[in-house]
Amino acid sequence: MRLVLIAAVFTTACVTASQNTRSGAAVENPIVQVGHPVLRERAKEVTTDQLGTPEFQALIARMIEAMRQAPGVGLAAPQLGVSLRAFVLEDRAELQTSLTPEELSERERVPVPLRVIVNPVVTPVSEERVTFFEGCLSVSGYAALVERWGEVEVSGLDEKGQPVTWRVRGWPARILQHEVDHLDGVVYVDRMLTRTYGTLPQVKARFAGKPIADTKRALGVK
C-alpha cells in the first residue's frame, strides 16, 4: 500500500482520480480505493509456477510504476486489484526532502532501494512500539496516527523466486508492516488511533515539523 509523505505523513501528494504523465496527458489511476472487496481479502500465495511467468513479472513492473507515479513508498498487489501476496517498497531520497533532519532522525528514516518481496512472513524482533502518522494510496487524502512494531524481520522470496530475509527498524519497518497488512485484508484505518484521523491538508497544517510527543499530546493520545 502506498504510504504517504507530507512532513509527518507518508506521501508527497495524495492520489486523485487520475494522474498526469510527463507528457501532460491524464491517465487513469490504477490504484483501487477502500471499499473495493479485494482490499478486504487475504491475498493468495504466489505459487512457484506463477513466479516466472511473464504475467507475474508484468504485475511487478506495474506495481513499481504505480508506486513511483503516485508517488509512494510502497504498494501491494491487492492495491492494483490483484489478490496475490506480493509488494514493492522503495523510499527514495527525493521523497524525504520535506522533512527536517530532526524529523528524519525521529522517524529513523533513510533512503531504501527498491525491494520486491513475495509471500512475506513478518516477525517482530523487539517489544518496542512506535507511533507516527500514516496515509495510504487506497485511502486517498487522509492520515492518522498508527502504532506499529519498531523493528521487524521479514522473510520471503524476491521477484525471481530467491529466498530473502530482511531485518529492519524505523520507517522502513513501518512501510513493510503497512504493506503486509494489505496482503491480509487490513487497511491502516483498522489500526489507527481514531481521534487522530484527518485530511492530509489538516494534518500538514497542524503538525508538520512538530515532534511526535507534541503531536500526540495535542491530539489527546498516549
Feature annotation, model-predicted:
Residues 1-2, 195:
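Generic structural signal for short, solvent-exposed loop/turn connectors between secondary structure elements
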Residues 14-177, 182-222:
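Active-site rim/adjacent substrate-binding subdomains
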Residues 2-13:
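Bacterial N-terminal signal peptides
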